[in-house]
Amino acid sequence: MKRAGKLLVIGLFSLLLSGCMFTTPETSLYRLPKLAGEYESLESQIDALLTNGAEYAAPTSGSNLQSVQMIDLDGDGSEEAVAFFRRTSDKKPMKIYIFKADGDSYERYAVIEGASSQIYSVNYADLDGDGLKEILVGYKSSSDVQGLAIYPLSPGTPESLLTTGYSRYANLDMNGDGKQELLIICSDEESTARVDYYDWDDGALHAKSSLRLSASVAE
């Protein structure tokens, strides 16, 4: 517990200095797909979604702002396509489609659904050390309500590994074990801020320690 507390303090300084999220820019991994070759099938599937009532709904904050983001989520050397849409007529309007390369085409692999009206931010990090990146999604329902949901890379409709309110968060490997730990700053019912330290243990994300802050933390 003492070790977790020390890591929490170290990580907190990194989080506060970094702004909303602490990430290492990988600009080559986040770009709009080329509209040629194997990307033609991806373009066709995206066009079908738009034709059927979906609209682009790119994240509005952070370093990953494209409506379609190309990134190798599973470490196999091929990029997956992560596409962000909104379908206002659905009970869960926010949609995150994941397409995987299959030979000379892209096939739909998973759809993440959210009840919020807006995706605030998205980040990708391997939190459990299995070589697959989890998807960290910041939802925003109003000017003062934010929720963080973390999804695994799994087929179908992935269920969140963790859902919580937050003001800021950071993911970084604080103890050198090859896994990304998670720091989340949030406010309680008395508007007092605290930072929670999460680590992957026994098949799930667990809150290891918590530190109350002397003042609230604005977004």
For each feature predicted by the language model, list its residue ranges.
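Sec-dependent N-terminal signal peptides of Gram-positive bacterial secreted proteins and lipoproteins
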Residues: R3-P25
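Beta-propeller-forming repeat regions
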Residues: C20-E219
